[in-house]
Regions:
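Glycine-enriched alpha-helix->loop->beta-strand junction motifs that scaffold or abut catalytic
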Residues: 200-202, 229-237, 272-274
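Divalent metal-binding segments
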Residues: 1-109, 125, 129-191, 204-207, ...
Length: 288
């Protein structure tokens, strides 16, 4: 139905898993390889969407949240959010960050059709860029190999990037030129290296900028990367619940004892007086 077969190449930033000793897909699509399936899924009606929003808003409000952040919106989602907030008195605010794609229109064109002003409690805050996948999914991009490689991979496997550095750098330059806030998904330390290198170039080109980009997840941020982050006004947002849900697996499977002991280095960020935030990435884990 999706047209994925033995001849279909891996897309940039994704992987089509294959059967052993064969090019025949085994049904598992990683990262950007999932996009073709997502486009084929049936879409709920506006009434169904609004009913879901009502439940989510009340659940989050009961937990004390007064602002919701959508970290990977698109134009259709944003129009839905605008309509929802215009249709009723929503007791929370929402900020959406639009996921931008490097191979489509220039960034200014992608952002031109939506205001960043607050409308009925909803606004577009900036853009979201994905640099890698997830460590527990073996798609986070690490500088050193995974402790135990996944099936079909050798001991050198480190995950892979969503974007090559030159494409990220192009997006960063456009964002800095137009003063557009940035959230950048970075689980693995190799992805964080690429982000830091790109931010150095952008800060050199636009030394008077006031942007404070955010490294989302920042699971494996190293000590040297914390130092660089402070100098570049990069704010890590740590997904600290990883320790509760996957701590033993990070230690025994994904990262090994040394790297797992340094996951989500909040204390080291504190020592440096580095501004950081924490999040739970709902619905990956519960918002409470």
């Amino acid at each position: 139905m999706a047209g994925i077969d033995a001849e279909t190449p891996d897309p940039e930033g994704g992987h089509i898993q294959r059967e052993p000793n064969s090019n025949r897909p085994n049904g598992v699509l990683e990262e950007t390889a999932m996009n073709v399936i997502g486009k084929m899924l049936p879409q709920p009606s506006p009434q169904q969407i609004f009913k879901t929003y009502d439940v989510v808003v009340q659940d989050l409000l009961a937990l004390g949240y007064t602002t919701i952040v959508e970290h990977a919106s698109d134009i259709a989602m944003e129009k839905g959010f605008e309509a929802y907030f215009a249709s009723r008195d929503v007791p929370v605010d929402m900020i959406a960050y639009r996921r931008v794609l490097p191979d489509t229109d220039p960034l200014a064109s992608q952002m031109a059709n939506m205001t960043r002003e607050d409308i009925n409690g909803f606004k577009l805050g900036g853009i979201k860029i994905l640099l890698d996948g997830s460590i527990q999914g073996y798609t986070g991009h690490l500088s050193q190999p995974y402790h135990v490689p996944p099936a079909g991979k050798d001991d050198s496997y480190r995950g892979y990037p969503h974007l090559p550095p030159e494409k990220l750098n192009n997006l960063l330059m456009q964002a800095y030129a137009d003063d557009i806030p940035l959230l950048v998904h970075t689980n693995g330390d190799a992805a964080i290296d690429v982000l830091l290198d790109g931010l150095e170039k952008a800060n050199t080109a636009y030394p008077d900028n006031s942007l404070r980009p955010v490294s989302i997840h920042a699971q494996t941020m190293r000590q040297d990367q914390l130092d660089r982050a402070k100098g570049l006004s990069l704010i890590p947002s740590f997904f600290v619940d990883h320790v509760y849900f996957w701590g033993d697996r990070h230690r025994d499977i994904f990262l090994g004892p040394d790297r797992a002991s340094q996951i989500s280095p909040v204390g080291s960020a504190d020592d440096r007086q580095l501004i950081y935030t924490i999040h739970d990435d709902a619905p990956v884990v519960s918002a409470d």
